[in-house]
């Protein structure tokens, strides 16, 4: 009875969402999470590999599409505006994840999209003064130097 309040449970119940298992795994730095039923009887375990697979499925890591990461102040975060910009470019947000950088307290907003070509979307975010810290996808636009170089080479071939 004396130690009852000093120990925290390092298990999840079978009815809990898998994110609770991820939280327990991180808190106790363990790769195996016990799963108990309503009577607190052990019904199984969840291993680190199973958690990683579940996190991959949950985050859409296996889905095809571009990823854009924005950085902003918490007070500037507006999901409806971000969604409006994305949808105005003909894209759909498949997954959106928000983390806070401990050093800067800025939000990192990671957006997983349903399309790969994102050059116009990158330009739209820049037009609305969003700070883009990362993106991966296909870009179809060319910069002026490439265009001018190609025109010069075509001219010299004539």
List PLM regions with ranges.
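Bateman/CBS regulatory modules and CBS-like beta-alpha motifs in cytosolic regions of diverse proteins
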Residues: 1-30, 35-38, 42-43, 62-63, ...
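A conserved regulatory-domain signal marking ACT and ACT-like small-molecule sensing domains
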Residues: 55, 65-158
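Residue-level signal for the start and early helices of compact helical domains
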Residues: 3, 9, 27, 37, ...
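Short N-terminal helix-initiation segments at or just after the protein's N-terminus
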Residues: 6-17, 50-59, 143-152
């Amino acid at each position: 009875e004396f130690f009852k309040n000093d120990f925290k449970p390092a298990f999840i119940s079978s009815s809990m969402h898998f994110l609770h298992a991820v939280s327990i795994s991180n808190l106790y730095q363990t790769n195996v999470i016990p799963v108990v039923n309503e009577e607190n009887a052990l019904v199984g375990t969840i291993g680190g590999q199973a958690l990683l697979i579940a996190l991959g499925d949950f985050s859409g890591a296996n889905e095809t599409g571009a990823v854009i990461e924005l950085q902003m102040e918490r007070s500037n975060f507006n999901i409806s505006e971000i969604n409006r910009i994305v949808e105005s470019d003909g894209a759909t947000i498949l997954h959106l994840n928000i983390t806070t950088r401990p050093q800067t307290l800025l939000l990192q907003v990671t957006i997983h999209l349903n399309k790969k070509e994102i050059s116009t979307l990158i330009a739209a975010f820049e037009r609305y003064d969003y700070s883009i810290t990362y993106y991966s996808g296909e870009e179809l636009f060319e910069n002026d130097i490439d265009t001018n170089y190609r025109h010069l080479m075509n001219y010299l071939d004539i």
